[in-house]
Amino acid sequence: MLEFEVLKTDARTGEGANAHPGSHARRGQLTLTHGVVQTPIFMPVGTYGTVKGVMPQSLHEMGAQIILGNTFHLWMRPGLDVMKQFGGLHRFESWDKPILTDSGGFQVWSLGDMRKISEEGVKFASPVNGDKLFLTPEISMQIQTVLNSDIVMQFDECTPYDTKGHITTESEARSSMELSLRWAKRCVAEFDKLENPNALFGIVQGGMYQNLRHESLEALVELDLPGYAVGGVSVGEPKEEMQRIMAHTPHRLPADKPRYLMGVGTPEDLVEGVGAGIDMFDCVMPTRNARNGHLFTRFGDLKIRNARHKADEQPLDTTCTCYTCKGRTMPDGSTSGGFSRAYLHHLDRCGEMLGPMLASIHNLHYYLNLMQEIRDALDAGRFGEFAARFRTDRLRGV
């Protein structure tokens, strides 16, 4: 099931002190099988059925409303027999809120020379044991039905920006986009055949070519799907190219359906994406960067392994209320005090497991809190003012 309601739009679209120029930002509510999601929303990525380094309890405490699972990797391990035994991904990973699963298309694309794409599907060697495997739109729908994810993504071909230095031509992008459209129709047919009660999203492709994006969008809209995603961005293209596609595509999708920007991105990308009309985001950046000592704060990014933090008694971000920065909440409402930059620097330099765990908690809290602040600003009709202040703060530096 899926119900989506737009609660408020950034109606002033560039007029007045609080407006965001050209804004298509909107505040919404998404009702799914396993719960209600307030949008715009960021979705933490749980590739193997876990958000790396973060306990489910911590995800609940920091306000995660929906997380991702990776169809391809869960198909490889633990496999469908185990998933069937548990009745899907929710019970398996002990998560009672909504889950979105990707189709496996991006992971197959990332295998490069290890895979062969045809009209029927993709043949490739398993990265786990080398077995020869075949993934089709139908099989992707079957896997995601077993996973019982609230949102199922169509199987698509992710159009690359370049391949070994060769920039994808319009002709190549068209061929890829049209294949994804044919696969989308097969996904719909199989999804309906399986009587999957959840929601299937289509994925707009077309590379960096606006005319192809428009054709893909129009063809997918004809399928009248519950929601739509913008795919094939943040795949190596210059930032200006992604921004050009974002200015063109999202607001042309149906206003009464949720819009999802796949695999993006930085805090700045999220704010710009909301302004472009996006409702949903996901990215591995908060946790991946955390594992590499790269932290996000209100006043810019911080590299905790730098020597200047060796004796720094400050928390990562004095404005942050996460466990890493503030510590436990005591019975009287006070906090126990968080961890210093010096301690986090020490953990990082020693390779201690707690280091990336605390860093991941902070980064995910930062992202989720950023989205809460965006929702609050939209509720108050002050998104433009918020976006301007956000940019100023981030440029200030830590």
Swiss-Prot record:
Known HAMAP family for this protein? Q_tRNA_Tgt (MF_00168)
Q: Which UniProt keywords apply?
A: Glycosyltransferase, Metal-binding, Queuosine biosynthesis, Transferase, tRNA processing, Zinc
Q: Where is this region: RNA binding?
A: 263-269, 287-291
Q: Which gene encodes it?
A: tgt
Please give the cofactor(s) recorded in the UniProt entry for this protein. Answer: Zn(2+)
BP-aspect Gene Ontology terms: queuosine biosynthetic process; tRNA wobble guanine modification; tRNA-guanine transglycosylation
Query: Which InterPro entries does this chain map to?
Result: ArchSynthase1/Queuine_TRR (IPR050076), TGT (IPR004803), TGT-like_sf (IPR036511), tRNA_ribo_trans-like (IPR002616)
Which pathway?
tRNA modification; tRNA-queuosine biosynthesis
Which Pfam families does the record cross-reference, listed alphabetically?
TGT (PF01702)
Subunit (UniProt): Homodimer. Within each dimer, one monomer is responsible for RNA recognition and catalysis, while the other monomer binds to the replacement base PreQ1.
The UniProt GO MF terms for this protein read:
metal ion binding; tRNA-guanosine(34) queuine transglycosylase activity
Tell me the cofactor note: Binds 1 zinc ion per subunit.
Active-site residues are: D102 (proton acceptor), D282 (nucleophile)
> What does the protein in this record do?
Catalyzes the base-exchange of a guanine (G) residue with the queuine precursor 7-aminomethyl-7-deazaguanine (PreQ1) at position 34 (anticodon wobble position) in tRNAs with GU(N) anticodons (tRNA-Asp, -Asn, -His and -Tyr). Catalysis occurs through a double-displacement mechanism. The nucleophile active site attacks the C1' of nucleotide 34 to detach the guanine base from the RNA, forming a covalent enzyme-RNA intermediate. The proton acceptor active site deprotonates the incoming PreQ1, allowing a nucleophilic attack on the C1' of the ribose to form the product.
Q: Which Gene3D superfamilies match?
A: Queuine tRNA-ribosyltransferase-like
User: Which organism does this sequence originate in?
Assistant: Polaromonas sp. (strain JS666 / ATCC BAA-500)
Q: What is this protein called?
A: Queuine tRNA-ribosyltransferase
Q: Which residues are recorded as binding Zn(2+)?
A: C320, C322, C325, H362
Q: Which family is this sequence assigned to?
A: Belongs to the queuine tRNA-ribosyltransferase family.
- Reaction catalysed by this enzyme: 7-aminomethyl-7-carbaguanine + guanosine(34) in tRNA = 7-aminomethyl-7-carbaguanosine(34) in tRNA + guanine
Q: Which GO terms describe its cellular component?
A: cytosol
Which positions bind substrate?
D102, S103, G104, G105, F106, D156, Q205, G232
EC no. given is 2.4.2.29
Keyword Cell inner membrane listed: no
